[in-house]
Amino acid sequence: MTQIHPTALVDPKAELAADVSVGPFSIVGPNVRIGSGTRIGSHTTVEGHTTIGAGNNIGPYASVGGVPQDMKYRNEPTRLEIGDRNTIREFTTIHTGTVQDRGLTSIGNDNWIMAYVHIAHDCMVGNHTVFSSNAQIAGHVEVGDWAILGGMSGVHQFVRIGAHAMLGGASALVQDVPPFVIAASDKSGNKATPHGINVEGLRRRGFDAGQIAALRQAYKLLYKSDLSFDEARTEISALLAQVDAGTAAPLQAFVDFLAATQRGIVR
């Protein structure tokens, strides 16, 4: 049975599964769909053309599905889609997309989004990510599966963060982070720079020694050699041709990510 607190305002046109709960003083708009078992905390707003899947837990004072902070926005019916089993903590803001992009902001499954996080318009967030408190991503950012963003980190618009990458706390990121790479600020300032392969994270997620060794070799070619970016890509592609099929999959993801960069990679 749906549990709606007497002080909550749920529009009659909203579609809520039978066991959704909505806390005190929360607002759910007319174009919202919420799946089974999702819990909306107190003083939370869910608005816009927003679809939320099953088993999510959205904390108090969150703002989900608000209009984009984009001066080009003209009240177009753009969307926000959130998958299943996500935790979205207090004071988080997540905005719908814009027609200048896909018209969609999307968040996958099993993500852990801590307090005061901002996910802007047209962002694409994968599965199993962690956004530490106060992490802020600008419009059109892509965050791959299992990526981790440290607290108070900031990400420039259109930047991509690859799968299994890690961004250190209080870091400013203005270019792409390849998959499996750690980027963090150093003593010279808060601009994120590369700091090696996320070895510990990969071990925890079941990557074997051969896969990790191949990624380390690719990292050295990209960051620790005198090769240009294009030369490094060529050498990494040659390395890919030499490894067995089991080792090749993460290395292929690394190569594909480099080939698709538009803003360049973190240096």
Curated annotation (Swiss-Prot):
E.C. number: 2.3.1.129
A Pfam family it matches: Hexapep
Quaternary structure (record): Homotrimer.
Family note: Belongs to the transferase hexapeptide repeat family. LpxA subfamily.
Metabolic or biological pathway: Glycolipid biosynthesis; lipid IV(A) biosynthesis; lipid IV(A) from (3R)-3-hydroxytetradecanoyl-[acyl-carrier-protein] and UDP-N-acetyl-alpha-D-glucosamine: step 1/6
Cellular localization per UniProt: Cytoplasm
Domain of life: Bacteria
Catalytic activities: a (3R)-hydroxyacyl-[ACP] + UDP-N-acetyl-alpha-D-glucosamine = a UDP-3-O-[(3R)-3-hydroxyacyl]-N-acetyl-alpha-D-glucosamine + holo-[ACP]
Function text: Involved in the biosynthesis of lipid A, a phosphorylated glycolipid that anchors the lipopolysaccharide to the outer membrane of the cell.
CDD domains (UniProt xref): LbH_UDP-GlcNAc_AT (cd03351)
GO terms classed as biological process: lipid A biosynthetic process
Stored PROSITE patterns: HEXAPEP_TRANSFERASES (PS00101)
Protein known as: Acyl-[acyl-carrier-protein]--UDP-N-acetylglucosamine O-acyltransferase
Keyword Protease: no
NCBIfam families: lipid_A_lpxA, PRK05289.1
Keywords carried by this UniProt record: Acyltransferase, Cytoplasm, Lipid A biosynthesis, Lipid biosynthesis, Lipid metabolism, Repeat, Transferase
InterPro entries, sorted: Acetyltransf_C, Acetyltransf_C_sf, Hexapep, Hexapep_transf_CS, Lipid_A_LpxA, Trimer_LpxA-like_sf
Species for this entry: Cupriavidus taiwanensis (strain DSM 17343 / BCRC 17206 / CCUG 44338 / CIP 107171 / LMG 19424 / R1)
Keyword GTP-binding listed: no
